[in-house]
């Protein structure tokens, strides 16, 4: 009887701990600059949401290739990923945006971002047309700011990245692309806006060592080559109850710029979900993924 009692107690504890694990709210975050950077940026957001919602919220840094399997399999409850991932997961699996992040630059709110086409400052490449036959690196073909925005721009200017480059490589992380261009491994590359400025602020590069191809001159505070698109959304996976999704979205939108969660992620805060129709148009234009003809 004693052994049976111990066994039953063990089973009960297993059930309790399993239930506790299931009760966690799991947010999958696209780790565009690696898992350590993702945790440094977003762990405080998990802590903030835990306090606001009264439920444990955990941050799971994910590689580009991990996002779709985790959404499809229900391994995460919410996803924070680039805008293209969002519209694809929306179309295929019914994820729903609950908030859109508002980036920060010198305290100014930025709800959009763009793509940057960069070369070394001493490169003979001057125009998009000059990129034909050159070695070009993107972050991942699935990276919106680090590939797909520039891909659309190139197609609109008569260059097919899949046919017209000597090499069309993936760097895996934004920093890798910048360093590959800096070290002459690649002739040119593309990353999302604010990558160069952040790397310069971290002492990894000097902005003067690079030149921007097809630079757009406007009041946006980061260099960019493409039109601007809405920032990353936080999205609820289809299995999440609507009330819980709404509460998490409201909690994010209540975040102030002085909170550690905002400071660590370099955000002003969060807004209601943006209009992502321009993102869908981009994926249609490059004939990509769920939007391929």
Language model regions located:
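Bacterial N-terminal signal peptides that target proteins for export
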Residues: 1-9
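Bacterial N-terminal signal peptides
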Residues: 8-16
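Extracytoplasmic small-molecule ligand-binding "clamshell" domains
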Residues: 23-87
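An extracytoplasmic/periplasmic, membrane-proximal ligand-sensing/linker region
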Residues: 25-44, 50, 195, 219-231, ...
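Bilobed "Venus flytrap"/periplasmic-binding protein-like clamshell domains
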Residues: 26-50, 110-178, 194, 262, ...
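Short helices/loops that flank or line small-molecule/ion binding pockets
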Residues: 60, 65-83, 88, 92-93, ...
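A structural signal for short loop-to-beta-strand junctions that line the ligand-binding cleft
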Residues: 95-110, 223-225
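Pocket-lining segment of extracytoplasmic ligand-binding domains
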Residues: 135-137, 141-240
């Amino acid at each position: 009887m004693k052994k049976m009692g111990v066994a039953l107690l063990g089973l009960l504890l297993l059930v309790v701990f399993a239930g506790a694990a299931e009760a966690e709210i799991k947010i999958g975050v696209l780790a565009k600059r690696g898992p350590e950077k993702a945790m440094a940026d977003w762990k405080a957001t998990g802590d903030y949401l835990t306090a606001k919602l009264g439920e444990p919220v955990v941050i799971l840094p994910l590689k580009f290739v991990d996002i779709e399997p985790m959404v499809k399999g229900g391994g995460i409850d919410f996803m924070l990923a680039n805008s293209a991932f969002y519209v694809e997961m929306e179309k295929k699996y019914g994820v729903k945006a609950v908030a859109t992040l508002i980036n920060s630059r010198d305290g100014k709110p930025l709800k959009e971002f763009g793509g940057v086409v960069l070369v070394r400052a001493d490169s003979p490449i001057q125009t998009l047309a000059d990129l034909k036959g050159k070695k070009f690196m993107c972050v991942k073909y699935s990276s919106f700011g680090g590939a797909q925005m520039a891909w659309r721009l190139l197609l609109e200017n008569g260059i097919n990245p899949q046919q017209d480059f000597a090499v069309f490589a993936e760097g895996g992380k934004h920093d890798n692309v910048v360093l590959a261009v800096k070290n002459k491994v690649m002739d040119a590359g593309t990353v999302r806006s604010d990558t160069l400025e952040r790397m310069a602020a971290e002492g990894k590069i000097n902005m003067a060592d690079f030149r921007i191809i097809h630079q757009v001159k406007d009041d946006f505070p980061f260099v960019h080559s493409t039109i601007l698109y809405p920032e990353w959304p936080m999205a609820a996976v289809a299995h999440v109850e609507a009330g819980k999704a709404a509460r998490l979205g409201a909690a994010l939108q209540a975040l102030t710029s002085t909170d550690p969660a905002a400071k660590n992620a370099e955000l002003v805060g969060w807004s209601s979900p943006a209009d992502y129709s321009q993102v869908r148009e981009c994926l249609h234009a490059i004939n990509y993924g769920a939007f391929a003809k």
